[in-house]
Amino acid sequence: MTEIAIPRLKLEHIYKSFPGVQAVSDVSLNVYGHQILALVGENGAGKSTLMNIVNGVVPLDSGKIYLDGQLVSIPSPRRALELGITMIHQELALIPELTVGQNIFLGREPRRWGIGVDWKRLYAQAQRELDRLGIEVSAQATIADLSIAQRQLVEIAKALSYNARLIALDEPTSSLTSRETDTLFRLVRSLREEGVALIYISHRLEEVFELADRIAVMRDGHLVAVGNASEFTPAEVVRLMVGRELAEFFPKVPAKRGEPVLKAVNLKAGREVRGVSLELHRGEIVGLAGLVGSGRTNVARLLFGADRLEGGEIWFEGRQVHLRSPQDAIRLGIGLVPEDRKAQGLFAGQSVRYNAGAGLIQRLSRWGFIRFQAVNRIVRELVERLRVRTPHLNQKVRNLSGGNQQKVIIARWLGLNPRVLILDEPTRGVDVGAKAEIHALMSELAAQGMAILMISSELPEILGVSDRILVMREGRIVAELSREEATQDRIMQAATGQL
Amino acid sequence: MLNGNHSSSFISFLRRTSTYLILLVILVWFALLSPEFLTVGNLLTIALQTSLVALVAIGMTLTIITGGIDLSVGSVAALSGALAAGLATRGGLGTYPGLLIGLLTGLGMGFLNGAMIVWGRIPPFVATLASMAIARGLTLVYTQGRPIAGLDKTFTFWGGQGALGIPVPVWVLIVVAFLAYFLLKHTPLGLHIYAVGGGEETTRLAGVNVGLVKFSVYLISGLCAALSGLILTARLWSAQPNIGVGLELDAIAAAVLGGTSLAGGVGGIPGTLAGAFIIGVLSNGLNLLEMPSYNQQVVKGMVFILAVMLDYFIKQRQAKPKGNPAD
Amino acid sequence: MKRSIIYLLLAFVLVLAACTPAAQTATQAPQQGGEITLGLVISTLNNPFFVTLRDGAQKAADAAGVKLIVVDAQDDSAKMTAGIEDLINKKVSALLINPTDSDAVVPAIQKANEAGIPVFTVDRGSNGGTVVSHIASDNVAGGKMAAEFLCKAIGGKGNVVELQGIAGTSAARDRGQGFNEYMSASCKDAKIVAQQTADFNRDKGLKVFENILQAQPEIAGVFAHNDEMILGAIQAAEAAGRTGIVFVGFDAIDDAVQAVKDGKLAATVAQQPALMGQMAVETAVKYLKGEKVDASIPVPLNLVTKDTVK
């Protein structure tokens, strides 16, 4: 970085507005080869729009884009690919029904006799690409059969097969285990060695500081800071992102631990859950840590009646209960905020009112008719209490940011006054400000006497929010740590079996 | 799960072959119960009768793989048959120009469907429901509701006996099925058809002209429907304005029985052919077994549900180890 | 999960097994040489007329000790052809065909001819192929029957109107022929003052008869080639306040039978589908036993009047 290089990508005074929003405002930014630039900002800060402009997904209003010193226009994703610009999206852009090779070469299949696809060549080339990157996946495997991490790596292989000179990665680790994250990081670093320019978008500041050479911070469409990573501290970055000082990352109101509400004894289900016992008390937040795949989500689903129990007992307020379906759990007052909010938690095409009120409808119906006024009143209260940022209750939920979507799901449960709330990765893909709000809300609920079980892959979150931490490994609970004795190291040791 | 590998490979075998196994079971069953069933003559009859549905089902399969559907096929078949027969006879154009116009009619209706879906952004179900009514209406307007007879031998040839004692419609089916198979499995368009059904936006971002892919499948579906209508007209020696009512349902059933997912992205020609033959064999076999027609409909419906459920359960079981996404 | 697959397979087998009882008789029948199996391919069983026809055929088959296989074409010419092909492969002794369409059925009949299976058409005829006999209602006799009744009802004299069906159809031709033959031969004092077509259609019947009412101040009786037209005519007469007209229809549809009960319609000529089915079976059996049968078997009709209606 001592030599003065021509930037791989040079953005000059980029502007872009959507109806009612100035999404990107006067952004000038250089991205160099042999470097990883971390682009951070809260959701809605304009990172995605900026990346979409660079990838030709949306046209810019004004400004100039230079690639290796050449002025270029990028009217389509196709053109971006031709220029060697690729983007790895948060929602993976792979077609699950097709094979790895077919996905990599989609739209530019090698031909035979002019009309046919040369499958042999396609698979050979794809396999060569995968092998080169050290990705242990068969080019003939179907995407649907791969893990999320493998798909992510395939996506990168696909990007590189375009001879990418600039790769943007949008939240690539949000669904990876730490081991998979390591693999990804290795790959990203080796790409840097090869001279690729990388833009890395993430909410996880630890990752940003681990990986990035430079950091660029966006807020409200503006680029508010850019510089070498060593010039920043995490606290500074957060302050720049939210534009205010966050007093406490994870505000935790100490709560009095009450009597036990939910007790699980030796739960068993398949290979994923092999004898889990736990107890939740009123007023406490229990963190459930462990690697992805350790069975955390399965335990949550068993406690919610979503999966069938093969062995063990569940006790609720001193009575043994048989949860045959989520309805049973809901009737008792157990709620689950699922990990995959788009697929399991939200009716994305419906309004905030509908999503927040969906759980109330049954209770607030009389003679088969929904009492809309009552539903409206409660929904409005909840939306205000949870500070859901939405222009109005009829806004489609898919247009809200991740954090606000999560709040809507929590609002739905609060309308039912649950005694136990299980949250599975409640802040995944949620920006820093909203994250703190969700944490504050959890501790407030606990203080009011609710028992909360939170699953999280983010250790700082687990450590900051939980009163008590359970660590799972291979279907069993292998450690129970109090707030005081828990550290990142102890949790990781338990989770990886190095105890 | 000590026998995990063993049982899962058995299940994956079942998954790949369930449609064919069901067809085989039905064939064996009828062969055991009816002495007339397993004769060359009867098997050829089944092939002949099935070819009409199978042709339409091939086009339907392509549309369904892209995540769409074509409800207009039955009406398009009737319209193509009527126009071809009418122009060949009363129009005085002769057989081949008539047949050509019949095929062009199918392409034209396919174009209309494609235009509504790609340019008009109308959901395929709605768009083709509309063209289904339009094509049927045009057929009735053109024929005034009456059959058109008086086709000459060059026309009726297409519904009759062909080389090697195999009926011409069966030959046509073989050729079309082969072409469609090649298209799906060995051409970029085929790959793109699967891709559009698996993820339209992803496909678009990969630089594929998604609109063109969709247009292609509706054009092909229209062409297949027209072929089926022309062959049916040749087989009946007359164009009947009310042929093909409900044909779309048989075609969808054949595709679904053959493992094509209505959600798109999955399916194939061999499966669809097997599905069409399940339907054809059932009709023929139940007639041979002298089952009263009312009961036949019940049995067909039940076999359909059972076959689809069996397929679903086998696939679900196969998918199970990966079913629970993250944890 | 494995268990549910087994249950499904079991259900699958059970459904197939449901076909067996019929099959057992099926496998025996053709093997006992000399047994007669008739195949009846019927245009539709969604119409009570044809259901009754089938019931009549079944009764006659039972009485004659022959087997009858019925295939429903569901008003679909392709299904009809397929059904005929299936029964040819089944090697039935004779085929009774009630075509969906007189042209579309021809190739299938030719296939039966090639297979040496005698073909009989019922109700609707075929425009080609070799057919042993055509069994259908005797529309000429029906027209005569209507004329005879009408003549008597108006006392043998007065002005008479004939509402005709679609020109060129066999029903319109035959019904009109029988009616006019009787009127000119045996009811000479009555005068046919108007003969107009109303296309078998109730609406047209109403409009056409309105005009006739304008032109003809004196009308004693009306005969229409079907009930739809006569019901239209009755409406027109009621609207115009004309009374004392004797109305006679054809087909005995439900509305018309009700009108007979109400006394608005004097009579309607009824086809006898059960008898048609019965005669079809009897004709085929006779032929298969080596007797000679006529090429055209007229099925008698039946007059529905206030006295005969149930």
Predicted segments, located by residue:
Chain B
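Helix-loop-helix "hairpin" substructures at the membrane interface of multi-pass membrane proteins
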Residues: L93-G102, L107-N113, I117, L164-A239
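Cytosolic-side transmembrane-helix boundaries in multi-pass membrane proteins
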Residues: M1-V28, L32, L205-L212, L286-D327
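Transmembrane alpha-helical segments in multi-pass inner-membrane proteins
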Residues: A225, R235-G301
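Hydrophobic core segments of alpha-helical transmembrane domains in multi-pass membrane transport
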Residues: T19-L32, G59-M60, R136-G137, V172-L183, ...
